[in-house]
């Protein structure tokens, strides 16, 4: 066989794929198609899941908000819209008893210390943070110094209270005001006790101090 005829046969085989080559090509294209389709289905499934998840989140948020609103309405209805703490009780008592002694007692001092801590956060600590912050941030060293400053202030208040109770066990003012608040607690109807928020405590104290100065 001549070399020329061999070359022509080779060219012809390259131009016209054999049945076996066609079958292999078909199988390869089918495999590629199958490998891509799960990705599309998975993507579509993920989009569907994300949409469904967003709907669930909105529904959960709405349900939580509705439950919170209902709980708040129930709480307001139960409490009758009146919430008391030692400051409000003592202020009302003094308004009706002009000869009442100066403030003192466990309930008075414990509430006063709580007020001091709240006032320290909302006023002094906030002001110091604003002075020291850079882009709304402070370093750990600065945070530590602020915390120790607050701790020193609170520690001194507790030491003063403990010193008074230790060295004045028979303080008549303590007995008087503790008795006033105990009687108030005894007369309160059997409702769930409600914790007074820091903002409410601070507001009550400021109002009380204003009345005392007048």
Swiss-Prot record:
It comes from Human bocavirus 4 (HBoV4). Its main location: host cell. It is found in: Host nucleus. The gene is NP1. The keyword Transcription regulation applies. One of its GO terms (cellular component) is host cell nucleus. The lineage of its organism: Viruses, Monodnaviria, Shotokuvirae, Cossaviricota, Quintoviricetes. Residues 1-85, 192-214 are annotated as: Disordered. Residues 44-55 have a biased composition (Basic and acidic residues). Residues 33-43 have a biased composition (Basic residues). This is Non-structural protein NP-1.
């Amino acid at each position: 066989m001549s070399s020329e005829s061999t070359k022509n046969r080779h060219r012809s085989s390259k131009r016209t794929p054999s049945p076996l080559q066609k079958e292999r090509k078909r199988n390869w294209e089918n495999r590629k198609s199958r490998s891509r389709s799960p990705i599309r289905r998975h993507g579509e499934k993920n989009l569907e899941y994300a949409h469904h998840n967003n709907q669930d989140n909105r529904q959960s948020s709405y349900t939580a908000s509705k439950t919170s609103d209902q709980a708040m309405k129930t709480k307001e209805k139960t409490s009758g819209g009146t919430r008391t703490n030692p400051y409000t009780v003592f202020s009302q008592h003094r308004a009706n008893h002009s000869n009442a002694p100066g403030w003192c007692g466990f309930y008075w001092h414990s509430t006063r210390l709580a007020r001091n801590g709240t006032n320290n956060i909302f006023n002094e600590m906030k002001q110091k943070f604003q002075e020291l912050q850079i882009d709304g941030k402070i370093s750990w060293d600065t945070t530590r110094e602020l915390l120790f400053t607050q701790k020193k202030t609170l520690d001194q208040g507790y030491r003063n209270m403990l010193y008074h109770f230790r060295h004045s066990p028979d303080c008549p003012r303590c007995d008087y005001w503790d008795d006033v608040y105990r009687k108030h607690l005894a007369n309160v109807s059997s409702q769930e006790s409600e914790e007074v928020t820091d903002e409410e405590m601070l507001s009550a104290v400021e109002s009380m101090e204003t009345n005392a100065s007048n």
